[in-house]
Structures are given as structure tokens and as C-alpha cells.
Design a protein with these regions (language model features):
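A short, proline-enriched helix->beta-strand linker immediately N-terminal to the Walker B motif
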Residues: 157-161
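Conserved ABC ATPase "signature" region
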Residues: 63-66, 115-133
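Catalytic Walker B motif of ABC-type/P-loop ATPase nucleotide-binding domains
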Residues: 163-166
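Helix-to-loop junction immediately C-terminal to a conserved catalytic motif
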Residues: 48
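Helix N-cap at the start of a conserved alpha-helix in ABC-type nucleotide-binding domains
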Residues: 174-176
Length: 231
């Protein structure tokens, strides 16, 4: 689902990504851990076209997003980005819209679904996430864990092939992380590939098929290991 080769990204004279190689396969949950400033979030943002890289390549679901300083055309980028879901660290839900309205916004505007089609799909997603009774609530009426699940639901509504999570438990009480972990593991059983950035090693061990350590703009291959059990 994701293939990155020799990826470089700089901010001015500061080199943040220094030749990153990374693969994520269908149904895999890959977690990237490492200290702040090591390049994890920049890598995630680069995959989602929120940052532009200078060299290397990014291929998503067999489609070339970026190669050797050149990005796909605007039309191609739009198609590729439909395969990527992103759940932000701060949820980024629209505060003036209900949970249901948050979820149907992108499918109607971007995918061209009718409101009826988008609503039917959204209600299925809310059922899967255990949020059916919160469909008409506004974000301020939700707990942190419920907001995170609603944010996941909004990303799922676009039917992505690769889901990216930026620190999905950082704003949650530790007692709520199991809820998010269970949702993520359920998604992987449906074949969705996931890339997760986190500082929470306990959470990483609960969800990951593979954990990669990243620091100083590079993947530390000697720290890659397979998780034998998801406790």
C-alpha cells in the first residue's frame, strides 16, 4: 500500500528527512516511534501531501505520488489522495457540525455521493465505532475518546486504502486508549493498511504488527522488530 524510497525533505537549511525507506503492506499496522524532532510527523505529512519533498519517491496503492522532485498532476494527486485517510492529533472536527454532518461532508463534496448515500454509509461507520447514539451530537458534547472515534469515522467515510494516524492517543486519558486500539485492530482485519506515529510505547505494542524507530531523519533499521503478540 505504501512504498517510500530514499526520501529527502528540508526546511531551509535544516534537513529533516535524510533518505527514508519504508514499506507498509495491505492489512499491516506499522507504528513509527522515536523522539520529538526526529522526522516522524514530517514523514506522515509528506505522505499526505501536506509537505513537499525534494528527492526520492512515494508510491501509494501502486500509484506514483512523487518521484525525483516531481509530483503527480493535480488530477492524479486528487485520485491518489482518495486512497489516504489522515486522523489528526487534535481531531480537527468541525465544531459547528454534528458528528453525522462531520462524516458526510467529504463524501458529498469530494466523492460526489448524494446526501442519502453518504448518510447511510456514515450510519454504518458510526455503528462500527459504537457512536450511533452520538450521531446528532456536536463535538463539544463528546468525550476525548468519542472525538477520536468520530475523527476516525470521518476518515473512514472516504474509504481509504491507507490510514495514517498522528499521535492518536496523545489527547486521551490512558483509560481510553484501549478503545482506540480496538478500533484500529478491527480495521486491519478488513485489509486496511495503517501507519501510526506515537510516543506511547504501550499503545504501540497493543496495536502494531511492526514497530520502527525513527530519529534524526532516518529509519533506524537495527531497531525494527516484529511484535510477537498484541497484548
Amino acid at each position: 500500500m505504501l512504498k517510500i524510497r530514499n526520501l529527502y525533505k528540508s526546511f531551509g537549511k535544516v534537513e529533516v528527512l535524510k533518505g527514508v525507506d519504508l514499506d507498509v503492506v495491505e492489512g499491516e499496522i506499522l507504528v513509527i516511534v522515536g523522539p520529538s524532532g526526529g522526522g516522524k510527523t514530517t514523514l506522515l505529512r509528506s505522505i499526505n501531501c501536506l509537505e513537499r519533498c525534494e528527492a526520492g519517491s512515494i508510491v501509494i496503492n501502486g500509484k506514483e505520488l512523487f518521484k525525483d522532485g516531481h509530483y503527480a498532476s493535480k488530477k492524479e494527486l486528487t485520485a491518489i489522495r482518495k486512497d489516504i485517510g489522515l486522523v489528526f492529533q487534535g481531531f480537527n472536527l468541525f465544531p459547528h457540525r454534528t458528528v453525522l454532518e462531520n462524516i458526510i461532508e467529504a463524501p458529498t463534496r469530494v466523492l460526489g455521493k448524494t446526501k442519502k448515500e453518504a448518510t447511510e454509509s456514515a450510519l454504518e461507520i458510526l455503528g462500527f465505532l459504537g457512536l450511533t447514539d452520538k450521531a446528532n451530537n456536536y463535538p463539544f458534547e463528546l468525550s476525548g475518546g468519542q472525538k477520536q472515534r468520530a475523527a476516525i469515522g470521518r476518515a473512514l467515510a472516504m474509504d481509504p486504502k491507507l490510514m495514517c494516524f498522528d499521535e492518536p492517543t496523545s489527547a486521551l486519558d490512558p483509560s481510553l486508549t484501549d478503545d482506540v486500539a480496538n478500533v484500529i485492530k478491527s480495521l486491519s482485519t478488513q485489509g486496511m493498511a495503517m501507519l501510526i506515529i506515537t510516543h506511547d510505547m504501550d499503545f504501540a505494542k497493543k496495536v502494531a504488527d511492526r514497530i520502527v524507530s525513527m530519529n534524526n531523519g532516518i529509519i533506524l533499521e537495527q531497531h525494527i522488530y516484529e511484535v510477537a503478540e498484541n497484548d
